């Protein structure tokens, strides 16, 4: 039996693009076996989140073992933990939980003030999210960003979402609100293996104006690493 501790869970970079085809095939195969909806991701999109260091990859001596990624919505007010998948050869050893903790830590590190949410039909993912402090919510509590919901169009259950006016589907909505965890700091449970890699950021110019309190903006930008 494979020892889960021998599996690396790293933040993705350009060097991991070579694993994309296997990641997408594993996702597609899982959707067929489960018979439930999984939104399809394109090669271009997965490459984008990898190059932007918004994804985590599990590797066993160079072999693909698992994957997940984050994405921000509504001007960084929300961030998703999405696409969690474990290769069949590495299931049942606790790897999914390790990936989930790492991708949640990445979301908190990159977007410390954002609400983190997840949509899932899987009991295992629901259980992992609950242990991290996520709570079930209605779809109304999630982002209204049209680009996010457009991603659901590739799911086999999209017609159910449409029939319910975008307010109900087979997925359970789970939300982690930082306002309910003010005493908790963003903690990275495991050392980021490629933490030293430089993440390119846009330049931000903050102009002060008399009578306008911009202290909240300074705090936000500082926490985001600017």
Where in this protein do the model-derived segments appear?
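Conserved hydrophobic beta-strand within the GNAT/NAT acetyltransferase core sheet
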Residues: 81, 116-119, 206-208
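Terminal substrate-recognition subdomain of acyl/acetyltransferases
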Residues: 1-5, 108-192
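Short amphipathic alpha-helix that is part of the acyltransferase structural core
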Residues: 1-43, 185
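ATP-dependent adenylation/nucleotidyltransferase module used to activate substrates
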Residues: 193-226
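Active-site acidic-Proline motif in GNAT/NAT acetyltransferases
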Residues: 87-89, 93, 123, 210
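Conserved acetyl-CoA-binding loop-helix of GNAT-fold acetyltransferases
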Residues: 86, 92-107
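A conserved beta-strand-loop-helix scaffold within acyl/acetyltransferase catalytic domains
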Residues: 24-88
């Amino acid at each position: 039996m494979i020892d889960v501790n021998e599996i690396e869970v790293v933040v993705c970079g350009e060097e991991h693009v070579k694993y994309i085809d296997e990641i997408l095939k594993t996702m597609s195969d899982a959707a067929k076996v489960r018979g439930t909806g999984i939104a399809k991701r394109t090669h271009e999109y997965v490459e984008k989140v990898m190059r932007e260091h918004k994804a985590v990859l599990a590797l066993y001596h160079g072999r693909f073992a698992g994957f997940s990624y984050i994405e921000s919505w509504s001007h960084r007010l929300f961030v998703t933990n999405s696409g969690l998948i474990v290769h069949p050869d590495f299931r049942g050893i606790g790897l999914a939980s390790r990936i989930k903790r790492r991708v949640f830590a990445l979301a908190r590190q990159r977007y410390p003030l954002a609400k983190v949410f997840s949509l899932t039909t899987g009991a295992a993912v629901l259980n992992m999210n609950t242990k991290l402090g996520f709570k079930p919510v209605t779809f109304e509590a999630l982002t209204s960003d049209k680009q996010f919901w457009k991603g659901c169009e590739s799911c086999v259950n999209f017609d159910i979402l449409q029939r319910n006016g975008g307010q109900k589907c087979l997925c359970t909505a789970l939300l982690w609100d930082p306002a309910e965890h003010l005493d908790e700091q963003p903690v990275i449970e495991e050392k980021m293996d490629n933490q030293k890699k430089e993440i390119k950021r846009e330049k931000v110019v903050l102009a002060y104006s008399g009578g306008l309190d911009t202290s909240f903006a300074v705090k936000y930008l500082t926490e985001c690493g600017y």
